[in-house]
């Protein structure tokens, strides 16, 4: 902040010069910084939330996670929802937060899941 203050107070001194300001993070709350980075990853398509519908049978979750891994994405979070869904009683809704390489990669992961027999879609 001191560098910016000097620039604002003495603009004539820096006129016509290329000036760079160094910002330090000593007073930035780490949780706020983490939140900013995470939201930036979402906007860049590097972090996505997807919903996958599947039969609620042993091995379904393992097949879903293996399919995501085979598509080259990393799973950050898993939320397995049985009760609060409009799906039939034999099905389950699984919400995943995944790390990807970008928007095209998200589409690739979804296509791979759908090709494997799951109903998968990106969530806002």
Task: State what each model feature region is.
Residues 1-2, 26-28:
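Short glycine-rich anion-binding loops that position phosphate/pyrophosphate groups of nucleotides
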Residues 1-17:
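Active-site-adjacent helical/loop segments in soluble small-molecule enzymes
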Residues 9, 17-18, 51, 63:
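Context-gated lysine
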Residues 9-12, 26, 101:
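Short loop segments at secondary-structure junctions
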Residues 30-124:
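A conserved regulatory-domain signal marking ACT and ACT-like small-molecule sensing domains
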